[in-house]
Amino acid sequence: MKKLLFLFDTDEMPSVFDTVVGYDGGADRVTGYANVTPDNVGALVDGTIYTRGGKDKQSTAIFVGGGNMAKGEALFEKVKKSFFGPFRVSVMLDSNGSNTTAAAGVALLAKAKPLKGKKAVVLAGTGPVGMRAAGFLGMEGADVTITSRTKERAEEAAKVIEKRFGIKVSGAAGATDEERAAAVKDANIVYSAGAIGVQLLPKSAWENNPNIELLADVNAQPPLGVEGIEATDKGKEYNGKLAFGALGIGGLKLKLHRECIAKLFESSEGVYDAEEIYALAKEMA
């Protein structure tokens, strides 16, 4: 029985990245659909759940992707609600790669040092990766703050994270180097989740900070989000601080993404969202 992966993408075009990883994760065929919404996904789900029976059903799976996490979450919920009884297939959510990227980064930090009770700051924490990273850090028992261009926007995103993960998150302004330096002054952990090619933290803000123990940056394109570290860093020490660059994190992210795809075909009842993906990341880190 061929392993079929259906990519339900909320963007105008299905993701090439997710298609490639789908094949590398073990799918025999990946079929992508664009502009998928909760309103039009019903017939697509029907095609996955009514065509195969018994153990053959586990050879069909759904991946929800696209660049917008809010749209992805709404679509993911609609897909799950369309299942009933034995009429279901395994499904995974990874809009914008946020679940796998954030999970890989935080899992590596958690392996390096205990995070419970530590002060963690997620720079540019209102994006999909930043919000998921904040959630995972909070799950580990860290005291989490996220930054954004305005404190108001950061606090709004913090409320969303709190509701989703049942943790406490604070918001802080981080529009300038000075504001971001102030935000990380007392931090033990810094997770930089900004846009590609945008430096968020100059070396002067962290190099001699005695509080900072761990640094993570998911920006692989120069200038990096954290000045002074390398994209390939995976636990490299800088002045007593352990750093993880985007490529150092990315190796685990890709392995994790592929492993999640493989697990979709192990049963017809798998549901892989933030918590499930993070648990797997910790096993693999």
Model region roles, listed by residue range:
Residues 111-189:
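Glycine-rich phosphate/diphosphate-binding loop of Rossmann-like nucleotide-binding domains
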Residues 169-244:
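Rossmann-like adenosine-cofactor binding region
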Residues 1-86, 276-285:
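N-terminal ligand-binding/catalytic initiation module
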